[in-house]
């Protein structure tokens, strides 16, 4: 009798709590953009030059105050019509588009409205909400633009890190350790509904030969024209999110003889290239504009021109820069922040104030009043000032 009762309870729990979460269906459109990165890297330049794809750059020093001192590494920049949001793992800082500091959002701690560590942010521009992902406590912490705490959203995604807004109250949540799961149970993204407080669907990882020696792997998501684009860490296809249940192929990356990672990329911590990864492609960031698809990889930076069908590549220098800024001669674009945030035909990044002072007068092609304004800006910087925000205006 005891065994029968246990079986009934088990069946009830499966029917109530064990309902299968749908897997997002992938569809091939036959209209994919093909990017032959292997052939492009056979003609790799020492570094990409900004003048190859950049029209102009606007430099905006972010205001430094006693309440606003950003950390050395800015994890994420989000730009809206009126504001700049900068997230440095400790907090989120809101500036106006001219760099004036407005307010801080969020605080570390264990109390109400606090987080242990905010791994990522996502901005809802319609409702003016800010989400922070605290994967230590398995929750999203929600604020308004002024920093007022609006509530905590508990979830059961144990390895959640980066979050991406799909539509108001619908978020795509990245998984960091899905490669440790069994074959057929590896899901790199979870589509989460705040209103329903549940995962609506999941994106599967179909690559069969995943090594478990790696600590974590990170899938990629970015927004283009209001649509999310996603790429699994191991897959060479970028998909467009049609709805929470369907994906359409958008870009196919032809890796040629380039390999996939078999062990962790220790260069991220040591700063030295691992000889075992000499032939690893390892794409870590992707963004897209009307004309360009921008990527950075273990091999260097990639700029694919959708208009001409050409692909330019360049290496990464000792200062971790992958794009030489030859318009104004500024410190260049960091490989760990290229590309990071794109809106329309603008790409947003930053360099620290002290880097502008250390760089001196670099080679530049802009010689008019814009360059004079740039030099005046540099002379007004102090070494311990907050970073300089860069609005990179791409060619159309």
In which residue ranges do the predicted regions lie?
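Asp-box/WD-like beta-propeller blade repeats and closely related beta-sheet repeat scaffolds
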Residues: 116-118, 133-186, 200-210
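Bacterial Sec-dependent N-terminal signal peptides
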Residues: 1-31, 77, 129
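Conserved blade-ending motifs and adjacent loop-strand segments that build the rim/top face
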Residues: 250-275, 308-344, 357
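Short beta-strand elements that form the blades of beta-propeller/WD-repeat-like
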Residues: 22, 34-36, 83-88, 128-134, ...
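Short coil/turn segments at the loop-to-beta-strand junctions that recur within blades
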Residues: 66, 106-114, 154-161, 205-210, ...
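Blade/loop signatures of beta-propeller domains
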Residues: 20-61
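Repeated scaffold domains used in trafficking and secretory/extracellular systems
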Residues: 72-76, 116-121, 158-166, 211-219, ...
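Blade-loop segments of beta-propeller domains
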Residues: 63-75, 94, 100-127, 134-135
